[in-house]
């Protein structure tokens, strides 16, 4: 495998996926990023077996191929290179040579066939959601996610697609945050799922202000297709508590306050 690529494009592509790589894994292959070069583009994939991110960037592919290289080390090397073209050359022993200007680095990789395969979503339930809308709903709820690992089903956000609405809920038993918005989808596509905390954070980071995200659900996994990036996550197995019963339905008194002024006052307190 051999390709040349802009340093910044290379770095952006790596950083987009490398955040899911765990530094405490017992499987060496999970410390690596999978790199596939073909058809004028390079695809990066990283996973910790619970969350997976894969993304594509343009490149000048001189020889097609696939390899896995140490993710953190590769990011560290590329981030220190000058703003110029970077050449990556990988031999049949999965040894990579990275060159940029007068700098040259050698990395030992692992065979790509040892890297976990991406799951299939052919039989998935599919939704189309505005990226900015989903990001805003996450922002308004994720702070209430429980960090108590003994309450496993609360270690994420509940996503519900019912009655023409998308509802996101998080609670730690003391606070409860709910964001609900209208969404068009077939009536038979009623669904409830719990997305883990790590996937929630990665999803918020990847979502943009414009465009649509394609959301796919199977029985135990979810996939979010955002432009040229795909995030896949396992879902939390369990039933989210009935939060509706703790939300007051009849309030005797209500107060309307200017949102901006209230926020500034709270910050000063």
Identify the role of each PLM range:
Residues 1-269:
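Structural preference for solvent-exposed beta-strand-turn elements
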């Amino acid at each position: 495998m051999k390709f040349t690529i802009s340093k910044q494009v290379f770095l952006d592509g790596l950083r987009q996926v490398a955040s899911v790589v765990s530094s405490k894994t017992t499987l060496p292959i999970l410390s690596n990023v999978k790199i596939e070069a073909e058809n004028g583009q390079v695809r990066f994939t990283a996973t910790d077996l619970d969350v997976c991110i894969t993304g594509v960037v343009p490149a000048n592919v001189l020889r097609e191929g696939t390899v896995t290289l140490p993710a953190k080390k590769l990011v560290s090397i590329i981030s220190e290179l000058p703003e110029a073209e970077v050449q990556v050359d990988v031999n049949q022993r999965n040894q990579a040579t990275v060159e940029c200007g007068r700098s040259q680095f050698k990395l030992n990789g692992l065979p790509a066939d040892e890297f976990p395969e991406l799951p299939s979503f052919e039989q998935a339930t599919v939704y189309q959601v505005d990226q900015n809308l989903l990001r805003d709903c996450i922002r308004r709820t994720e702070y209430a996610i429980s960090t108590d690992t003994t309450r496993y089903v609360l270690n994420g956000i509940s996503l519900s697609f019912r009655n023409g609405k998308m509802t996101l809920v998080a609670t730690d038993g003391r606070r409860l945050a709910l964001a609900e918005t209208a969404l068009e989808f077939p009536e038979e596509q009623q669904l409830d799922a719990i997305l883990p905390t790590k996937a929630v954070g990665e999803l918020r980071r990847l979502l943009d202000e414009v465009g649509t995200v394609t959301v796919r659900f199977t029985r135990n996994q979810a996939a979010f297709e955002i432009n040229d990036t795909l995030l896949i996550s396992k879902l939390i197995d369990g039933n989210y508590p009935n939060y509706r019963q703790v939300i007051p339905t009849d309030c005797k008194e209500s107060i309307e306050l200017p949102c901006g002024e209230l926020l500034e006052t709270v910050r000063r307190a």
